A protein has these predicted regions:
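Bacterial N-terminal signal peptides that target proteins for export
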Residues: 1-7
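Hydrophobic alpha-helical targeting segments used for export or membrane insertion
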Residues: 8-12
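C-terminal motif of bacterial Sec signal peptides marking the signal peptidase cleavage site
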Residues: 15-18
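Surface-exposed, beta-sheet-biased, low-hydrophobicity segments with strongly acidic/polar composition
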Residues: 20-213
Length: 213
């Protein structure tokens, strides 16, 4: 009888441990969040050289809390990414005190469900004009057409982000213009000028520290 009780107890313990291990490996998919019309150093007018003028501001954003962060907290780890015109910064390297990093994945947002183990996260290095999310037309998330003066997100480009505190997120830029629209080449000069630098994007943030979405 005692042996039976011991055996039953051991069996129950093993079953509980097995269940516990199974529960630890369960990954709950995260839902995508859409951010609309996030202003990013919006245009105030044209300079004498015909170039757009602005206040040269930067908009800081927390992917953890899904909200803009005050510029007075730029030297903190409260923000994860920042926007200024077409430039996107991460909280790491020369851009901030965090351990953030990023790389650009070529593929669809929905099908990118896990970060490969051999992925290399780059950091910002403003001194060398090198950024985790590269600057320039065709290099990361957008193209610029000099004839139409329009900025267009590139389909199938996913920004993979390591946040300021070491968690992970993925981002897809949907629109660069107010209202989340794609401006036609025939849009007015005023629309092209003053509706730009308003980001609409969607992102998925994994709060548990894993690299699976």
């Amino acid at each position: 009888m005692n042996l039976q009780k011991i055996a039953m107890g051991l069996g129950l313990s093993i079953a509980l441990v097995a269940c516990s291990k199974d529960e630890e490996t369960i990954v709950v998919p995260v839902s995508a969040i859409t951010v609309k019309d996030l202003a990013a150093d919006t245009v105030t007018g044209l300079g004498l050289d015909g170039r757009p003028q602005s206040a040269l501001t930067t908009t800081y954003y927390s992917l953890v809390d899904n909200k803009a962060i005050a510029s007075t907290d730029a030297a903190s780890t409260k923000w994860d990414i920042a926007f200024s015109s077409t430039k996107i910064l991460i909280n790491g390297g020369t851009s901030g005190p965090g351990i953030g990093g990023a790389f650009v994945h070529i593929g669809s947002f929905d099908s990118f469900t896990s970060i490969p183990a051999d992925s290399i996260f780059k950091t910002d290095n403003a001194n060398a004009a090198s950024y985790a999310i590269p600057l320039g037309s065709g290099k990361a998330w957008y193209t610029y057409d000099g004839l139409t003066t329009l900025v267009s997100p590139i389909a199938g480009r996913v920004l993979v982000i390591r946040t300021a505190t070491g968690k992970y997120a993925k981002i897809e830029i949907i629109s660069y213009y107010k209202g989340g629209v794609t401006l036609p080449s025939t849009a007015s000069v005023n629309d092209k000028l003053f509706k730009q630098r308003y980001y609409t994007f969607r992102y998925a943030y994994q709060p548990n520290g894993s690299k699976t979405f």
